[in-house]
Amino acid sequence: MLILASSSISRANLLKTAKIDFRQVSFDYDENLNKNISPFLYVQKIVLEKERQFLSTLGKDFQNQNLLFADSIVCIDEKILTKAKDKKEAYEMLALQNGKYASILSAFLLVKPEKRVFSLSKTTLYFKNFDENALRDYVENDLYKGKAGCIMCEGFHQNFITQQVGNLSTALGLDIQTLKAYL
């Protein structure tokens, strides 16, 4: 059995859909790291920091188990977009994507008793212009909350994607194809 060390509903749904036997363990992580580095390094450091925090607090309870740590960020060029703190920040992030593109970087660390596997994947989504009413509804109803870069591939953004380069599961927060290869 896999232990998903994350409160992400999206990641849990991806594992269920892939028929991977898992148990979800929610943990409140401090994700405040210096964002003045490349987005690729940033998401990797976040995953390693999640592992460190989880093991320092709950490590005794999960010895010799298969643990999965994951994180996703959105970047536009080299600008890192994490989770919006409020509606103003959500509107700013969405304005950067409107009629343009955004890349989702998803990293995971699979810790097994006999090995460690680290994976970094990228999916780029290209968008047509957002409908202003749909955008306002999305933000004003707080649907952006908890979403890296305010991106909701299975919701708001779905209607505006013109091209996708990479796996949908990566855009949703976990590269399932790669994970399955190492389970």
Curated annotation (Swiss-Prot):
It comes from the Bacteria. GO terms for molecular function: nucleoside triphosphate diphosphatase activity. InterPro entries: ITPase-like_fam, Maf-like. Nucleoside triphosphate pyrophosphatase. May have a dual role in cell division arrest and in preventing the incorporation of modified nucleotides into cellular nucleic acids. Belongs to the Maf family. NCBIfam families: maf, PRK04056.1. This is Nucleoside triphosphate pyrophosphatase. It comes from Campylobacter jejuni subsp. jejuni serotype O:2 (strain ATCC 700819 / NCTC 11168).
